[in-house]
From Swiss-Prot:
GO terms for cellular component: cytosol. HAMAP family: RecA (MF_00268). Can catalyze the hydrolysis of ATP in the presence of single-stranded DNA, the ATP-dependent uptake of single-stranded DNA by duplex DNA, and the ATP-dependent hybridization of homologous single-stranded DNAs. It interacts with LexA causing its activation and leading to its autocatalytic cleavage. InterPro entries: AAA+_ATPase, DNA_recomb/repair_RecA, DNA_recomb/repair_RecA_CS, P-loop_NTPase, RecA-like_C, RecA-like_N, RecA_ATP-bd, RecA_C_sf. This is Protein RecA. Residues 330-352 are annotated as: Disordered. It comes from Psychrobacter cryohalolentis (strain ATCC BAA-1226 / DSM 17306 / VKM B-2378 / K5). One of its GO terms (molecular function) is damaged DNA binding. The lineage of its organism: Bacteria, Pseudomonadati, Pseudomonadota, Gammaproteobacteria, Moraxellales. The gene is recA. Keywords: ATP-binding, Cytoplasm, DNA damage, DNA recombination, DNA repair, DNA-binding, Nucleotide-binding, SOS response. It is found in: Cytoplasm. ATP binds at G66, P67, E68, S69, S70, G71, K72, T73.
Amino acid sequence: MDDNKAKALKAALAQIEKQFGKNTIMHLGDNSATLDVDVVSTGSLGLDIALGIGGLPKGRIVEIYGPESSGKTTMTLQAIAACQKQGGVCAFIDAEHALDPVYARKLGVNTDDLLLSQPDNGEQALEITDMLVRSGAIDMIVIDSVAALTPRAEIEGEMGDSHMGLQARLMSQALRKITGNAKRSNCMVLFINQIRMKIGVMFGSPETTTGGNALKFYASVRMDIRRIGAVKNGDEIIGNQTRVKVIKNKMAPPFRQAEFEITYGEGTNHLAEVIDLGVEIGAVGKAGSWYSYGDEKIGQGKANSVLFLKENPAIAEEIEAKIRAEKLGTKDDSKVATVDKANEEQAAEPVQ
């Protein structure tokens, strides 16, 4: 760049910063403009790895969708528990009016510190969400679910009235406001969504999600969760075999997937994943039905090995750290990197 252009650019940047504030515009390579983001674990080690950054990104819009009883709310409650363990403040916008606090506690959620709202209509739910995001004090907000964000006009109208596109317009307008505020506040907004069928589709999948197309565009991460089988103890079904596909990912390569077990009343079988992935990278030895770590045998069969790791959490954490270092290139399981200092200061201030 010649001197005249460089001077003109410098003057323009100075004018922009004077008018709109420091760090409004910067070079992408600057240390202060780092793109590394804080992450929150999903509760599933395999899914954290499939996401490519070690968890769900803060400051972004995230969508998780799937059929009924596939584990959507379970996954989000586990993410809330992980966020709280990092010292974060979380909120749950329960538009379906179906949150079970007893089950949430079983999954590790501190219900005393969890903010809960059960709004009357979609406008109220999204306005509450935006106000919480702009406060700068919330780390994670879950909206359960998009399908239950019923527009006020539909609630006040008659049962047979037609309200074409109302919910889609509501979501589009709300996301335009929330997305920028979420980035500035470093607050993750996680939408749970349901599946509907499109009529008359001859080719391709007839499935679609509710609430229009806006959420598909604004979401940095979209996950499709499905129940693919049952986990049995003898003849008794004790859980679901679950598969999650990362359909969209702006943080890492998309289309990866993870399979894991969700045990009823307990959540993801995290230690079973630690053993499987430990064997995959060579951190855990397997000879016949015996599993070993270093020179120590940890159990015969996966069930006994899980019990051993449950009784020896330090060994489980050590194996998990090795898995994350191998798969993600990081030894810290709580975050990939910190947000730059300027952004932290900005996130601490309420967004006007």
